[in-house]
Amino acid sequence: FVDESTDMQEAARAYFDHVVEQYGYEGNLYVTGHSKGGNEAQYVMMTSEHRSEITACYSIEGQGFSDRAIERFKKDNQDYEEILGRMFSINSDMDPVHKLIGVIIPEENTYYVNTHYEDSDGKKNYTYVHDVRGIIRGAEIDWQRDEDGNITHGTEGWLSRLAGILNDNLQKLPEDKKGACAIALMETIDLLQGGSMDDATAFRSDYAVLEIIGIPLITA
């Protein structure tokens, strides 16, 4: 949340580079992942030794990066803007997670798809708003389309918009408080969905910072 990189991001980059170098490839080369996997796919796109060979990155509901990480990406990539042009964000229109931290994927490459968060009995189940099952209808992504059937960028729902507002205010916090609030918010979201953070844990001190400093600023 404030670090330049995480162990999981570095592991993803090392694994990708190893596979490409060990086995090679023919045709197009893609990186993709969901949630933290989407974040790691973006990281690979920015840091891999083979990033110039990657056709595209598809981040599905993946988070963004700290200011320090983004500064590093720009410093290490003279073709930073060109790389961004090959990165795409695909999200449930209700997903709250992809708006967290510093978003780098351009708005013109961001798509919102229809969310299906009803149980078999028809009751709303919000655990699906950040779950690949929530954006799949049958065996395909349920894209938002225009009246002619063409895929559109879509319209984000209220929960996604709220997450964007929260994140914008979160970015106003001092650097040493920003990480604590971000991790507490993300773990709260995951716990509400019945899951857990992939490689991070919020401590009592993080929740204290969120309660004392973060929430008053976010709701101001």
Located regions from the model:
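Alpha/beta hydrolase fold serine-hydrolase catalytic domain that processes acyl esters and thioesters
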Residues: F1-N28, S48-A220
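Gly/Ala-rich beta-loop-alpha elbow adjacent to hydrolase catalytic centers
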Residues: T32-G37, A41
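Short glycine-enriched nucleophile-adjacent loop
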Residues: A41-E49
